[in-house]
Amino acid sequence: MKNERRFGMLRKVCAMAVASVLAVGCLTACGSSKNSGPLTLDQIKENGKLTVATEAAYEPFEYMDGDKIVGYNADIFAKICDDLGVELDYIDLPFQGILAGLEAKKYDVVGATLGVTAERASKYTMTYPIQNGTTVFVKRKGDDSIKSIEDMSGKKVGTQTSCYNEDDTKKFNEKLQSEGKEGYSELLTYDSFPEAFAELKNGKIDLVAQNYASCAAVVMKNPDDYEIVCDDSGKAEMVGTDTWVSWAVRKEDTELSDYINSEIHKFKEDGTLAELQKKWFGEATDLPESDYIPAE
């Protein structure tokens, strides 16, 4: 699970350039409405499909099961399309350049797991959040030496290099030290989170810092190996800036973004979203419908 792809971190310039060509130049047959004006719900119904672009490599949000895209996001989009009376046209693309393809009207929505940032919100309509991406810590199951995030002094902590979780982890260590505590014995970074979790399982590190949703999924799949560090009430302890996960729609396509938001709201109210969260992450999460876009 390559978290930095999802939450706005930079990649190499050459990779971005190649992916932009793939997303913009090579998808002329994939796309949504080529009209110069805003895309309307009537046009989507006339087309008979909602075209959604993602990178199906981020389990459990979206990933390939044989030749089909499945996951948490896929389940939500399937319900949205059912309610709209259209087919779900899912496109699997490299993540870099995927937003450029949205601007070029090659598809209707970017339904990848996007972290909500001020920069993205200035360019696109970011839908209501569908998950929590704030940084949490995972320890080995039964490690009683870590009862809360205040017990991390002297511990080895791992995370993925060049992602916002690394920044949050460094800042939390600085907070511990500013309070007169020792702080981590070591902060190690890895090329991927699966590598970090393998090191945790093998006892080479004591904690892994990653976004909440992904950690919940890891713990659900490996309940005998890992657990999230929680407070006395059993609630996950989070550090850093609140980070929410949502999707991107073109600014001018207000009918579509309003419809998607109304569906997310409905799924929250009728319990559908909670059921899907429990299915894919093991537990339900409270999600905001306002004040979820960070300040500049």
Identify the meaning behind each predicted range:
Residues 131-139, 222-262, 283-296:
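Periplasmic-binding protein-like
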Residues 51-59, 69-82, 134-192, 212-214:
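Bilobed "Venus flytrap"/periplasmic-binding protein-like clamshell domains
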Residues 32-38, 164-187, 227-228, 261-296:
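Ligand-binding clefts/hinges and TM-proximal coupling segments of bilobed small-molecule sensing domains
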Residues 78, 82, 87-151, 233-237:
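Acidic, polar ligand-binding/catalytic clefts
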Residues 89-100, 144, 183-202:
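Short helix-initiation/N-cap motifs at beta->coil->alpha
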Residues 36-113, 259, 279:
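Extracytoplasmic small-molecule ligand-binding "clamshell" domains
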Residues 97, 114-122, 167-175, 206-241:
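A ligand-binding cleft/hinge motif common to bilobed small-molecule-binding domains
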Residues 31, 74-83, 143, 150, ...:
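Extended ligand-binding regions for polar small-molecule ligands
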